[in-house]
Regions:
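A short, glycine/Asx- and small/polar-enriched loop/turn
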Residues: 45, 150-153
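A structural micro-motif
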Residues: 3, 26, 48, 72-73, ...
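Rossmann-like NAD(P)(H) cofactor-binding subdomain of soluble oxidoreductases
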Residues: 14-22, 34-110
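Active-site-adjacent beta-strand anchor residues
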Residues: 7, 52-53, 144, 148
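Rossmann-fold dinucleotide-binding core
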Residues: 76-151, 158
Length: 166
């Protein structure tokens, strides 16, 4: 039996990842706002991955509360993520994925391009996402990750500006 994956946040994106982990054979434990993170870490001290998939506005409050037992197992996905977002909390090398697919409520996933991933559990993210037909491209270095995160940020700013014009 495979080690579990803990999901902090189980919205639209979290639900997609949870489905991928389940399809790949990993038990998934969701952690919602009502669940104490320290208690969850005591109950599941050594998960394969702790994937934080919360809304942009909630990311920092979750990272502030993350139990030290999970520091080496953290995975992050966020639209406007940059290294400063995790470095300030002491996470040296989290697993990070820059998501290049859309998921709207009541609609199927729409893949734009393969999502780049880097970090200790990037292969796990690739395995899970590809099990549900979402391509993931593994990166070889932190500098490649930084480049991909900046590209994603530029894309978001550009689409937001374009939306203001129309």
């Amino acid at each position: 039996m495979k080690s579990p994956v803990v999901m902090i946040g189980i919205g639209e994106m979290g639900g997609v990842f949870a489905r991928g982990f389940l399809r790949a054979g990993y038990p998934v434990y969701p952690v919602t706002r009502q669940i104490d993170l320290a208690g969850a870490a005591r109950a599941i001290p050594t998960p394969e991955l702790v994937l934080v998939s919360v809304a942009e506005n909630d990311l920092h409050s979750v990272l502030e509360q993350l139990p030290p037992a999970w520091f080496q197992r953290i995975g992050l996905l966020q639209n406007e993520l940059l290294p400063g977002d995790w470095e300030q909390y002491g996470f040296a090398q989290p697993t990070v994925i820059s998501v290049w697919f859309e998921k709207k409520k009541g609609q199927d996933v729409k893949v734009l391009i393969p999502s780049p991933a880097f970090g200790p559990q990037a292969g796990l993210l690739q395995e899970a996402m590809e099990s549900i037909g979402i391509p993931v491209r593994l990166l070889a270095s932190a500098s490649e990750l930084l480049f991909e995160l900046v590209v994603k940020n530029v894309y978001i700013v550009t689409t937001n500006c374009a939306g203001l014009v129309t």
